[in-house]
Amino acid sequence: MRFINPKTDFAFKKIFGSDQSKAILISFLNALLYQERPVIVDLEIIDPYLAPKIQGMKDTFVDVRARLQDGRKVIIEMQVLNVEGFEKRVLYNAAKAYSTQLMVGESYKDLSAVVALTITDFVMFPEWPEAQSAYMLKEKERLTDYPEGDLELVFVELPKFRKELEELVGVKEKWLYFLQKAPDLEVIPETMGEIAEIRAAFQIANVASLSPEELEVQERKMMYIYDQRGVQSKARAEGRAEGRAEGRAEGRAEGRAEGRAEGRAEGRAEGRAEGRAEGRAEGRAEGQEEKAKEVARRLLGQMTDQQIAEISGLTVAQVAVLRAEK
């Protein structure tokens, strides 16, 4: 038995956003949003998943949307690649879901709360060790809640969840393990299969249950992720290697020249020692920075300033200057 990776937008919506996924989504949301308490007893999946009918279909699997029994809206997004402006996009989507509820003539009191659940395959908040965090509107000094707590942002950072199968406790941890490890498993683990909704999720993710068109879409999604990660990794490695090589060469040359000049003025012994040391250090630094700029210039037409900064080691401001000079 093989399972598809549930972290692609296609697979995530098929598993959690199909017409037959109501019980799965209720279990998932109760586990992540309400400490496994049965707060959600019913919901309506908005714009449910539809199987692809033609090749070359567009990327329509943005997120899963649901309306709870009390009218609240939940939007769930699975994000694999870290892109520039993602934090603002989360806020924009939540605000849009909240602000577009009313028709002309309707009252603001009819607005329903919105919860944006964002699951990432990268670390968003390195300052916090916990995998899950939640944000709401609060008073700046006293940290009291805004009277209408209608907007809530919940984040789950999968890389921070590192438990193994035998360490799992509770439904929430089993759902996170499912998201991380499903494609590595060959059978449904007994302790996870005991939960009907997780067992059903595994069955939907079973490769044997997918149509050829769905398998093709999933393969394209995975290939895109691999390609993007490969581009970033290769550029990062090449930038470091070239920067080190040029830094060494320039450092040696400048170190010899400065060492001779200072040695004549201050004494051959001290001049050579200090000149070589300072020259090598300054040469390496200048050489690496120049090489980093060269790498950044090559990537200007392919990536955002934030991505280029992460790969080259430059600051976002330095990348912006290079883009302006281009």
Identify the residue ranges that each predicted region occupies.
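Elongated, amphipathic alpha-helical interaction scaffolds
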Residues: 1-326
